[in-house]
């Protein structure tokens, strides 16, 4: 079952990206290197509720 998640920047805490994930394949919280337009750089983004 795919669920909607939001990715938040770890530097400025802005919620920049919405995506989906398969909870069966990825039960843990996702972490991705993404571009933050507020920090103007690539930063680590973590899954939020």
Swiss-Prot record:
Span of the signal peptide: none
Domain of life per record: Bacteria
GO CC field: cytoplasm; ribonucleoprotein complex; ribosome
Gene Ontology BP annotations: translation
Keywords for the protein's UniProt record, in alphabetical order: Ribonucleoprotein, Ribosomal protein
Database matches in InterPro entries: Ribosomal_bL33, Ribosomal_bL33_CS, Ribosomal_bL33_sf, Ribosomal_zn-bd
Gene3D superfamilies recorded: Ribosomal protein L33 (2.20.28.120)
Pfam families per record: Ribosomal_L33
Keyword DNA-binding: no
GO molecular function, one term: structural constituent of ribosome
Family, as annotated: Belongs to the bacterial ribosomal protein bL33 family.
Protein name: Large ribosomal subunit protein bL33
Lineage: Bacteria, Bacillati, Bacillota, Clostridia, Peptostreptococcales
């Amino acid at each position: 079952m795919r669920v909607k998640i939001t990715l938040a920047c770890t530097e400025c805490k802005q919620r920049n990206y919405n995506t989906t994930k398969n909870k069966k394949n990825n039960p843990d919280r996702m972490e991705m290197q993404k571009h933050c337009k507020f920090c103007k750089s690539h930063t680590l983004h973590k899954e939020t509720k």
